[in-house]
């Protein structure tokens, strides 16, 4: 049921695409047994940035669906001998790769990939601080699994480094599309970067931001994307914005705590909140299920 050739950004997805992917993901969450729906398909993972959860989720998904899964080690590839990224992509296409999963630190790089791989399917696994659509789909599927099919009217609070977060941007676009109220908690130094079109409220107070929240989505400080001095020190950030049990007591009893990872314990989330939040582990499991669903939907 090939419905989608390129998954580059949230806007790439129709409502039908999203609904089918979420439905498939929920099925795969309930039944994680391997199958051969992608037998004979070749998928290449091309990651120019470090990754644990996203890369592992794709590799597990690819192999459990019967695909030939190849992860190109950039450090040992011909790119270290001077081969251009464009030539590497053209080589993958010529070798008959069916789908390329790409992560890059450069915003918009995914569009250059599309130009080089012809009819090959492409998935954006994160490009700079631009978008991370598969993580947003994971988060949406998790919220729906825990809160029900319709998220219209839910209060979703996103807290942290909005300025550098591709996860936040994709989630704002996706969740607001289905009627969720997006509230942002961020230090003043990052508030200017918040896109007003997808946001209901911006505050610099964690307590104010979470008091009516149905979902709290925490983001780490992305030091690797900061040039020069940090906008805010880790100590100052943790004093004002770390979610601990005392602050969490302000929120609703049934609030969902989410984090795309990696978590920086003691900075944006305390040990006790991290260890008690079963929804964060569900989010990780859903990450594999969603990647299975996406691959099945695009290649199955």
UniProtKB/Swiss-Prot annotation:
<feature type="binding site">
    <location>
        <position position="135"/>
    </location>
    <ligand>
        <name>carbamoyl phosphate</name>
    </ligand>
</feature>
<feature type="binding site">
    <location>
        <position position="53"/>
    </location>
    <ligand>
        <name>carbamoyl phosphate</name>
    </ligand>
</feature>
<feature type="binding site">
    <location>
        <position position="81"/>
    </location>
    <ligand>
        <name>L-aspartate</name>
    </ligand>
</feature>
<feature type="binding site">
    <location>
        <position position="262"/>
    </location>
    <ligand>
        <name>carbamoyl phosphate</name>
    </ligand>
</feature>
<dbReference type="GO" id="GO:0004070">
    <property type="term" value="F:aspartate carbamoyltransferase activity"/>
</dbReference>
<dbReference type="InterPro" id="IPR002082">
    <property type="entry name" value="Asp_carbamoyltransf"/>
</dbReference>
<dbReference type="GO" id="GO:0016597">
    <property type="term" value="F:amino acid binding"/>
</dbReference>
<feature type="binding site">
    <location>
        <position position="261"/>
    </location>
    <ligand>
        <name>carbamoyl phosphate</name>
    </ligand>
</feature>
<feature type="binding site">
    <location>
        <position position="220"/>
    </location>
    <ligand>
        <name>L-aspartate</name>
    </ligand>
</feature>
<dbReference type="GO" id="GO:0006207">
    <property type="term" value="P:'de novo' pyrimidine nucleobase biosynthetic process"/>
</dbReference>
<comment type="similarity">
    <text>Belongs to the aspartate/ornithine carbamoyltransferase superfamily. ATCase family.</text>
</comment>
<keyword id="KW-0808">Transferase</keyword>
<dbReference type="InterPro" id="IPR006132">
    <property type="entry name" value="Asp/Orn_carbamoyltranf_P-bd"/>
</dbReference>
<protein>
    <recommendedName>
        <fullName>Aspartate carbamoyltransferase catalytic subunit</fullName>
        <ecNumber>2.1.3.2</ecNumber>
    </recommendedName>
</protein>
<comment type="pathway">
    <text>Pyrimidine metabolism; UMP biosynthesis via de novo pathway; (S)-dihydroorotate from bicarbonate: step 2/3.</text>
</comment>
<feature type="binding site">
    <location>
        <position position="103"/>
    </location>
    <ligand>
        <name>carbamoyl phosphate</name>
    </ligand>
</feature>
<feature type="binding site">
    <location>
        <position position="166"/>
    </location>
    <ligand>
        <name>L-aspartate</name>
    </ligand>
</feature>
<dbReference type="Pfam" id="PF02729">
    <property type="entry name" value="OTCace_N"/>
</dbReference>
<comment type="subunit">
    <text>Heterododecamer (2C3:3R2) of six catalytic PyrB chains organized as two trimers (C3), and six regulatory PyrI chains organized as three dimers (R2).</text>
</comment>
<dbReference type="GO" id="GO:0005829">
    <property type="term" value="C:cytosol"/>
</dbReference>
<dbReference type="GO" id="GO:0006520">
    <property type="term" value="P:amino acid metabolic process"/>
</dbReference>
<feature type="binding site">
    <location>
        <position position="54"/>
    </location>
    <ligand>
        <name>carbamoyl phosphate</name>
    </ligand>
</feature>
<keyword id="KW-0665">Pyrimidine biosynthesis</keyword>
<dbReference type="GO" id="GO:0044205">
    <property type="term" value="P:'de novo' UMP biosynthetic process"/>
</dbReference>
<dbReference type="InterPro" id="IPR006131">
    <property type="entry name" value="Asp_carbamoyltransf_Asp/Orn-bd"/>
</dbReference>
<dbReference type="InterPro" id="IPR036901">
    <property type="entry name" value="Asp/Orn_carbamoylTrfase_sf"/>
</dbReference>
<dbReference type="Pfam" id="PF00185">
    <property type="entry name" value="OTCace"/>
</dbReference>
<dbReference type="InterPro" id="IPR006130">
    <property type="entry name" value="Asp/Orn_carbamoylTrfase"/>
</dbReference>
<comment type="function">
    <text>Catalyzes the condensation of carbamoyl phosphate and aspartate to form carbamoyl aspartate and inorganic phosphate, the committed step in the de novo pyrimidine nucleotide biosynthesis pathway.</text>
</comment>
<feature type="binding site">
    <location>
        <position position="132"/>
    </location>
    <ligand>
        <name>carbamoyl phosphate</name>
    </ligand>
</feature>
């Amino acid at each position: 049921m090939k419905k989608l050739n390129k998954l580059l950004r949230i806007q790439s997805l129709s409502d039908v695409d999203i609904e089918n992917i979420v439905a498939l993901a929920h099925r795969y969450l309930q039944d994680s047994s391997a199958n051969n729906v992608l037998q004979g398909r070749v998928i290449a993972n091309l990651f120019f940035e470090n990754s644990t959860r996203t890369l592992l989720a794709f590799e597990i998904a690819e192999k459990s669906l019967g695909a030939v899964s190849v992860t190109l080690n950039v450090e040992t590839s011909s790119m270290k001998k001077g081969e251009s990224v464009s030539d590497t992509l053209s080589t993958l296409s010529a070798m008959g790769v069916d789908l390329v999963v790409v992560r890059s630190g450069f915003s918009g790089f995914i569009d250059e990939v599309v130009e080089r791989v012809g009819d090959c399917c492409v998935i954006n696994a994160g490009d700079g601080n631009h978008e991370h659509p598969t993580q947003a789909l994971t988060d949406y599927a998790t919220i729906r699994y825990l809160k029900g099919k319709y998220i219209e009217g839910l209060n979703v609070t996103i807290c942290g480094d909005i300025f550098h977060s591709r996860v936040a941007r994709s989630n704002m676009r996706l969740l607001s599309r289905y009627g969720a109220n997006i509230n942002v908690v961020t230090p003043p130094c990052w508030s200017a970067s918040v896109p007003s079109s997808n946001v209901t409220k911006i505050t610099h107070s964690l307590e104010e931001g979470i008091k009516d929240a149905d979902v709290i989505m925490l983001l780490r400080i992305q030091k690797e994307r900061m040039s020069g001095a940090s906008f805010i020190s880790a100590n100052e950030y943790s004093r004002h914005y770390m979610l601990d049990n005392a602050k969490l007591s302000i929120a609703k009893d049934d609030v969902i705590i989410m984090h795309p990872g990696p978590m920086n314990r003691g900075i944006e989330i305390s040990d006790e909140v991290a260890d008690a939040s079963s929804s964060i582990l569900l989010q990780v499991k859903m990450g594999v299920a969603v990647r299975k669903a996406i691959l099945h939907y695009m290649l199955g």
